[in-house]
Amino acid sequence: MLSRLSQTALVALSLMTVLTEAVPSRMRIQTRDSVNYQSEIVRGVNLGGWLVLEPWITPSIFENGGGAAVDEWTLAEVLGKDKARAILSQHWSSFITQDDFNQIAQAGMNHVRIPVGYWAVSAPDEPYVDGQLEFLDNAISWARAAGLKVMIDLHGAPGSQNGFDNSGRKGPIAWQQGDTVARTVDAFKALAERYLPESDVVTAIEAVNEPNIPGGVNEGQLKEYYNQVLEVVHSINPDAGVFLSDGFLATASWNGYANGENVVMDTHHYHMFDNTLISLDINAHVRAACEFGNQIKGSDKPVVVGEWTGALTDCTKHLNGKDIPTRYEGQWANSPRYGDCGNKRQGSSSGLSEQERSDTRRFIEAQLDAYEGKNGWLFWTWKTEGAPGWDMQDLLANGLFPNPPTERQYGNQCA
């Protein structure tokens, strides 16, 4: 027999259930399980090439569009919306599944960063196709089941914030012209309202990926956009972390801005896109990684290295852009030849030489040491169609990425 207290509790529970079920799930704040980005170490991976396409991650998709398809905009433009939607829907449903999230968790990760473009929310009168949010919804459920945290990353903004193919549209930077910033705020707000209530899983959101200040993005206007983003997040879930790109400036240059606002600086570090860094031997690569780790310690805010990789060259097919040659083989103007790409163009890391495999493992370990000296890291990327050094799933399978990520074959190289 139930006591009066038990009966009262059951009535209250029933009423709570009715009221909860009356609220749409996407508007409901789940039990808060926020991450303290000041003190906790982020260990994670990006799901690149899934909901935002890049030719080097999934070259087979771009083969459908011929030479004119150099980014997601032109791919959809060439194919037309119906064919593009059919191809992309198949890709979205198969490239990343629950099994990937399980593998990521089993490898010792605690976060995934999921890039998504503004066109998933709204792209009127543009070639893009939508439908990505259904799969992003699935990803939140998969992360919950696997015990992973999610950071939503607005990877592409109207007009392109950097001119790179990974923004959705390669070419001139037109972000901050016309109504592009207002449209970006609208897209960000729609994503925040949809996903930040899932606060047991979605613990952070990124304002915009890689706004290119050296390439022409106005820093003052970028800060104004960031201020609007912070207001949006605080109105929905003030416990959520807000990742702000450094815009390719030193992270310390942002000191004094938005302190106490749950802000995390996002910096990206690649060696193969710099003519000096690409020329280094493995010992110098390790030193450079450790020096970068020391540099980011100068920030007065948490810093997560939101993109980095194990590749030491730009040999991967289409990495510099669709059908663009490599610096490493001296095919750029004023770029000396550093070596032969060989098996570094495509395939598995198992096809690399023994020395290349050893160098890859050592470089990855050095970066882990360096970035955990601040607040952590998110590797780019989880899966590709065959990009040696870039594919965490493949690196794990071949023993080139530490599992767990604290395992070391080379000791602490930044000590």
Swiss-Prot record:
Transmembrane segments: none annotated. The active site is at E210, E307. It is found in: Secreted. Its EC number is 3.2.1.58. InterPro entries: Glyco_hydro_5, Glycoside_hydrolase_SF, Glycosyl_hydrolase_5. GO terms for cellular component: cell surface; extracellular region. This is Probable glucan 1,3-beta-glucosidase A. It comes from Aspergillus clavatus (strain ATCC 1007 / CBS 513.65 / DSM 816 / NCTC 3887 / NRRL 1 / QM 1276 / 107). The lineage of its organism: Eukaryota, Fungi, Dikarya, Ascomycota, Pezizomycotina.
